Amino acid sequence: MKRIALLATALAFSACSPAAEPPVPAPETPAAEATPPAPSVTLDVLTADGIGPLTLGMTKDEVIAAVGPTRTPDAVGGPEPESCEEFRPERAPEGVLVMIEQGKLSRISLVDMSTVKTDKGLGLGDTADTVKTGYGDQAKASPHKYQDKPAEYITWWKGGPRTEPYVQDEAARGIVYEIDGTGKVGAIHAGGPSIQYVEGCA
């Protein structure tokens, strides 16, 4: 009889005890948001000294910090990339090509119908006559290496026309307008003596 009384007491106590609360779930950690791509850098006016944040003489690391690495990492930028290479920075506008020689920025080119203009307001697609009018007697025309007229090179150097057949002064700065077989600007190169190259790094 005593056992029955004890069992009844235990059951009554259990019924009066509050039910155990369910464990509180840990707050969910929000998924990390994908890092948005860096915006393109404003590069809208090309001069003989550079464009936007790019200045002739910058190191390759400085160029990459300013406008990003190459858009095409698997492409070879030149036959000897250790001494000279060209690449299209991923945050630069389409058609902007930079040349790195001996680890430093030596030339900036506009190709592939880039919409960037020079400080004279000239760009790809302009006629040779428009370029010559813009510079007057400060620019010099020379035959194109691979194409017949009207293809030619129109070269302008800061400080006036140069008399030497090939400018080697590392401090020289200029712009070359490469005129194609239709008589229009097909490419523009700005920078130091390397603006005279006709085949990439050569």
Whereabouts are the PLM-identified features?
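Glycine-rich loop/hinge motif
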Residues: 120
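Sec-dependent bacterial lipoprotein signal peptides
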Residues: 1-14
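N-terminal low-complexity, Pro/Thr/Ser-rich intrinsically disordered segments
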Residues: 26-61, 65, 202
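A cross-family detector of function-defining hotspots
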Residues: 60-101, 128-182, 192-198
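Acidic/histidine-rich, surface-exposed loop or edge segments in extracytoplasmic proteins
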Residues: 40-49, 106-116
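Bacterial signal peptide processing site
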Residues: 16-19
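Structured C-terminal subdomain patch of bacterial secreted/periplasmic proteins
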Residues: 186-189
